[in-house]
Amino acid sequence: MNKNGKTGLNSSLLLLSCLFFTGFTQAQYGTQSGEWLSYGGDTGSTKYSPLDQINPDNFVELEIAWRWTSVDASLPLDALREDNPDIQIGNFQATPLMARGTLYIITALNQLAAINPLTGETLWTHNPESYLSGPPINPLSYHNRGLAYWSDGEKERVLAGTHDGYLISLDAKTGIPDPDFNGGRVDLNIGIPRATRNNLD
């Protein structure tokens, strides 16, 4: 076999190997056991669940099991708007996480909550009061796309970025700020010279 033939064969084998491992990796994606551990479902952001209890045949039979009222509704919004007229709670864009039998959610005003998925009962809430710091430091105003969940098999943490530039970490079971995470939050503005609160420039 000439040199060109060997090169072509090697290239073909390399391509087949890449396709094989890519297919194998993709097969590992997808949520497991109904859990939704990331914004897109899994680390591959497949947004896919293999659960099949709900299908086109029984979709019309679905009924509302419970409703959940956002904890933002319990805030004195009129009083808050006197200091910050831009506050709003209508931009709800978060995707709830489902981890180890609990739903986790973040509201438009950065309040976090854990919810029993069977009953809709609120298990705990955490209010970092980021809305008291003034307008969000991001240009997208008051909304949040979601949370992150982390576990080492024993400890469980829920993490979220806030409008005023902090990253908070809470115990997923209790909602208590993580003492090993700088008391529960770190300042993301540190080390970024042009990033200052109340200034979008």
Describe the residue ranges of each PLM region:
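Blade/loop signatures of beta-propeller domains
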Residues: Y29-T69, A73-S74
